[in-house]
A protein has these predicted regions:
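C-terminal and inter-domain tail/linker signature
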Residues: 1-96
Length: 96
């Protein structure tokens, strides 16, 4: 059971980053729990999928980013995970 929880968490995280790299916001949102808490560096915490969707729409208008060299770390029980990556991108518009 633990191995399947680990694999399920890893698959969800991989699906999220695949959607991110494809610019598929709906696919990203499908990977999130309804009560997601998005902690932005140098910003306030956004709570809920709707707030995260608003953030994604804003970012898509200002930036084009791809995440490369992705490494996913998952606890054995699947309850905690982290990802490491390198961001490659460009500015599309001045961020207000």
């Amino acid at each position: 059971m633990i191995a399947s929880a680990n694999a399920a968490s890893r698959a969800t995280i991989h699906a999220y980053f695949t959607a991110f790299n494809s610019g598929d916001i709906a696919g990203m949102l499908a990977c999130l729990a309804p009560d997601v808490a998005h902690h932005v560096n140098e910003g306030q915490v956004r709570h809920g999928v709707e707030k995260f969707a608003e953030f994604c729409a804003h970012m898509s208008a200002s930036y084009s980013e791809t995440l490369k060299d992705l490494v996913i770390f998952v606890a054995e029980d699947g309850e905690r995970a982290a990802a490491e990556f390198v961001v490659h991108g460009r500015y599309l518009a001045t961020d207000p």
